[in-house]
Amino acid sequence: MSEASATKVKYSRVLLKVSGEALMGKKGFGCDIEVLDKLSHDLKEVHSFGVQLCLVVGGGNIFRGASASASFGFERASNDYIGMLATMMNALSLQNALEKVNVQSRVLSAIPITAVCETYIRRRAIRHLEKGRVVICAAGVGSPFFTTDTAAALRGIEMGCDAIFKGTQVDGVYSADPKKNADAVRYDKISYRDLLSLDLKIMDVAAVSLAREHSVPIIVFNLGQPGSFADIIRGDGLYTTIYN
């Protein structure tokens, strides 16, 4: 019996949001090869369960459009397009890491860059998933002023994912930053309404509102903990579920 058939999973198709900061590791800029290697092995384990896996990558480890606009007065729209190109670099790096561990993947970009990847088309992306390939979505939604968190919510909804996974540096949603406040309380579950009313900045309001409107749960967990993603897919591990 294969591992995929022997492993009972809670989800069959999921979207994972991978922030640029997560890929940066301790380097302070760019992609940490060790982080890419560890992440690719974690993704390979989940993929081996037969789970259809879609990723949306951020670009904050290379360039943040909003920050550049605020700090230097640069035009926000142009900065956001630069940020989209940063997500492309991360997506290609992640694709290489996955294929190094023998996991087939495809990068699909919201803006056409046909020399290096496919342009995102929903039906094409779903077909790749059905063929057992990991789909890596780059360039956000393809328009400025929208975050990659919003892109994650949008792609998760339109591709019919069972849940949207938000990988962070802590094991769920807390009432305050647990690294700064020892009294911070971790939630096992929290509603979209409470998340927004308490102003807990896990994802931006547009992303949370999209997921809420379409009743797609958001799972917040520690992406840096080896095996945590696979544990949750099996129904174990520490995480917070954001729900309607």
Swiss-Prot record:
ATP binds at residues 17-20, 60, 64, 168-169, 174, 177. Pfam families: AA_kinase. The keyword Glycoprotein does not apply. It is found in: Cytoplasm. It catalyses: UMP + ATP = UDP + ADP. One of its GO terms (biological process) is 'de novo' CTP biosynthetic process. Allosterically activated by GTP. Inhibited by UTP. Its EC number is 2.7.4.22. GO terms for cellular component: cytoplasm. Keywords: Allosteric enzyme, ATP-binding, Cytoplasm, Kinase, Nucleotide-binding, Pyrimidine biosynthesis, Transferase. It is an enzyme of class 2 (transferase). HAMAP family: PyrH_B. Belongs to the UMP kinase family. Homohexamer. This is Uridylate kinase. It comes from Ehrlichia chaffeensis (strain ATCC CRL-10679 / Arkansas).
